[in-house]
């Protein structure tokens, strides 16, 4: 490809090629979509996956038997009247169907029952017990297997084996990711 110089620039320059492309640009694209005609053959099956339905989608929420306990910690207000704890901030969720029995009514409350709160905080262990968050063993299992309860300098508690194994892979606390090493934790004697 030879290029000849002109006063206006090279004949086969990129700018000249761009100008010719723009001059012979594609025709305007039509704004309306044209339907494609499908030709059915004897052996082919056509499956419509567009899911265009004229009826609205209805989700039935009346038959959900699952219960979710949400623990919202609120500070008590001064001079606030003390309400009974059972149903103070609760509402009844029931079906609009009169035919269904009333024993299916569910109380929804912002307060968590004391026994559910204790189980939710530390698994199935009551509060005040020590367990390793990695292997989930309690104090008695840890001691029976010859391990120690250890605490990092950031205050997190583990069994000695789990923390040692964790520090082999990463020199950080498994809970808060603060940099620690094998010299930065100590046993706790209970």
UniProtKB/Swiss-Prot annotation:
It is found in: Cytoplasm; Nucleus; Nucleus, PML body. Sumoylated; conjugated by one or two SUMO1 moieties. Autoubiquitinated. GO terms for cellular component: cytoplasm; microtubule end; nuclear body; nucleoplasm; nucleus; PML body. PROSITE patterns: ZF_RING_1 (PS00518), ZF_RING_2 (PS50089). GO terms for biological process: negative regulation of protein localization to chromatin; positive regulation of DNA-templated transcription; positive regulation of transcription by RNA polymerase II; proteasome-mediated ubiquitin-dependent protein catabolic process; protein autoubiquitination; protein K11-linked ubiquitination; protein K48-linked ubiquitination; protein K6-linked ubiquitination. A motif (SUMO interaction motif 3) lies at residues 57-59. Widely expressed at low levels in many tissues; highly expressed in testis. A motif (SUMO interaction motif 4) lies at residues 67-70. The modification Phosphoserine is found at residues 94-95. Pathway: Protein modification; protein ubiquitination. The SUMO interaction motifs (SIMs) mediates the binding to polysumoylated substrate. Homodimer (via RING-type zinc finger domain). Interacts with GSC2. Interacts with AR/the androgen receptor and TBP. Interacts with TCF20. Interacts with PATZ1. Interacts with TRPS1; negatively regulates TRPS1 transcriptional repressor activity. Interacts with PML (isoform PML-1, isoform PML-2, isoform PML-3, isoform PML-4, isoform PML-5 and isoform PML-6). Interacts with PRDM1/Blimp-1. This is E3 ubiquitin-protein ligase RNF4. It comes from Homo sapiens. The gene is RNF4.
């Amino acid at each position: 490809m030879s290029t000849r110089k002109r006063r206006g620039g090279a004949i086969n320059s990129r700018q000249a090629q761009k100008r010719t492309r723009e001059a012979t640009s594609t025709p305007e694209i039509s704004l309306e979509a044209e339907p494609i005609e499908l030709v059915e053959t004897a052996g082919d099956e056509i499956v419509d996956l567009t899911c265009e339905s004229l009826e609205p989608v209805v989700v039935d929420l009346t038959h959900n038997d699952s219960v979710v306990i949400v623990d919202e910690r609120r500070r008590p207000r001064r001079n606030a009247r003390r309400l009974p704890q059972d149903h103070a901030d609760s509402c009844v969720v029931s079906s609009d169907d009169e035919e269904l029995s009333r024993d299916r009514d569910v109380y929804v409350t912002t307060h968590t029952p004391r026994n559910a709160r204790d189980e939710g905080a530390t698994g199935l262990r009551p509060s005040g017990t020590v367990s390793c968050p990695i292997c989930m063993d309690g104090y008695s299992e840890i001691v029976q297997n010859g391990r120690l309860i250890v605490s990092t300098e950031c205050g997190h508690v583990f069994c000695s084996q789990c923390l040692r194994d964790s520090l082999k892979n990463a020199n950080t606390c498994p809970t808060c990711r603060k940099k620690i090493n094998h010299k930065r934790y100590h046993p706790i004697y209970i």
